[in-house]
């Protein structure tokens, strides 16, 4: 289901981009344009961003080989705080101001776009929609997990072979690990049942978080890629290559951390990582394909990109503050350690500072 949502989002963004290319009223200036040099820089950008995204997403998964990077270590908490700071600055410093500029552009008619702060409205609604999706999806998958656990326990209680039931449920639990379902076949006292239920709830929550988080990243990554790919100005593209490579690298660390905590099967984890890594490069290729007809100042392009930027900012704000920072800062291990609180607070501020600094070039 999550993969279908991501694929649908990408297709809709591509269609909107083509529509924007056909509607050109405010014509851009050709000053400083160099198609040949721009094309070379775009190819370099595709390669650099692909490598940066993949490397960032892969770092948290190294915890299987390096114990210091496991989800329960101080280093992992610090990395997540740093990545959350990057994501927060991305939303507030990079995406939200761009949306305000686009929806307030003089190329748009005076009403209603330039008379009402649609950027704030869309960002707020996107954050609320993310909250509702987060809550509903978590509740749904938890219920599925409880139903699956009850079914397996019933088979075990009747003296039957639970393995066939376990195999069947493994393909349908959507967010429940095989270990969690299998644990239902073993006798537990009340305390063990409580701990098991808590672990199961955390697992489901991490899986929902990682999927909603990736959906938010996809929205703004496609737009960024299309904008870069459609540009014919080397002076515009050159600083974006380095800025976007670092941007995608840090976002990859955040997403990779969520994927590791969600304990997806290897195939699902690799699919999510590949999808994230390819999103911006695919956007660049779409931009290259429509660059001859695309006009970033057309009303359609400004409205569509402005609304999607605002929605992406709202989603990322919610994910960074609620699902990443609040969850870690409220973690009992963090609350009991003043030293760890200080470390992740500093790393959070460093992430915010570095990503805000990139706003000078991107």
Curated annotation (Swiss-Prot):
GO terms for molecular function: zinc ion transmembrane transporter activity. The chain crosses the membrane at residues 43-63, 75-95, 121-141, 208-228, 240-260, 270-290, 302-322, 342-362. This is Zinc transporter 9. It is found in: Cell membrane. Residues 64-74, 142-207, 261-269, 323-341 are cytoplasmic. It comes from Oryza sativa subsp. japonica. One of its GO terms (biological process) is zinc ion transmembrane transport. Residues 22-42, 96-120, 229-239, 291-301 are extracellular.
């Amino acid at each position: 289901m999550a993969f279908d949502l991501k694929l649908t989002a990408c297709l809709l963004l591509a269609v909107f981009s083509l529509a924007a290319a056909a509607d050109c009223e405010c014509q851009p200036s050709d000053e400083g344009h160099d198609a040949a040099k721009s094309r070379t820089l775009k190819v370099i950008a595709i390669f650099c961003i692909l490598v940066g995204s993949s490397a960032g997403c892969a770092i948290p998964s190294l915890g299987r080989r390096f114990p210091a990077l496991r989800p329960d270590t101080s280093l992992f908490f610090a990395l997540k705080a740093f990545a959350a700071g990057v994501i927060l600055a991305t939303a507030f410093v990079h995406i939200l101001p761009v949306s305000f500029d686009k929806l307030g552009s003089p190329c748009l008619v005076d009403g209603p776009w330039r008379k009402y702060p649609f950027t704030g409205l869309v960002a707020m609604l996107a954050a609320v929609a993310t909250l509702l999706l987060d809550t509903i999806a978590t509740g749904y998958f938890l219920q599925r997990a409880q139903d699956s656990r009850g079914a397996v326990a019933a088979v075990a209680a009747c003296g039957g072979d639970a393995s066939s039931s376990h195999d069947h449920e493994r393909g349908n639990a959507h967010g429940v690990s095989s270990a969690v379902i299998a644990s239902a076949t073993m006798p537990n006292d009340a305390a063990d049942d409580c701990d098991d239920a808590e672990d199961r709830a955390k697992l489901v929550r991490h899986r929902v978080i990682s999927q909603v988080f990736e959906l938010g990243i996809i929205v703004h990554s496609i737009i960024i890629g299309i904008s870069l790919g459609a540009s014919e100005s080397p002076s515009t593209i050159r600083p974006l290559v380095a800025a976007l490579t670092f941007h995608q690298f840090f976002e990859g660390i955040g997403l990779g951390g969520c994927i590791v905590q969600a304990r997806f099967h290897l195939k699902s984890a690799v699919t999510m990582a590949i999808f994230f890594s390819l999103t911006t490069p695919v956007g660049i290729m779409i931009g290259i394909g429509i660059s001859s007809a695309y006009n970033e100042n057309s009303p359609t392009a400004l409205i569509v990109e402005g609304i999607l930027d605002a929605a992406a900012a709202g989603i990322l704000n919610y994910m960074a503050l609620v699902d990443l920072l609040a969850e870690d800062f409220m973690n009992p291990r963090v609350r009991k350690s003043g030293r760890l609180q200080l470390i992740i607070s500093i790393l959070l501020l460093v992430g915010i500072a570095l990503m805000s600094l990139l706003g000078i070039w991107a």
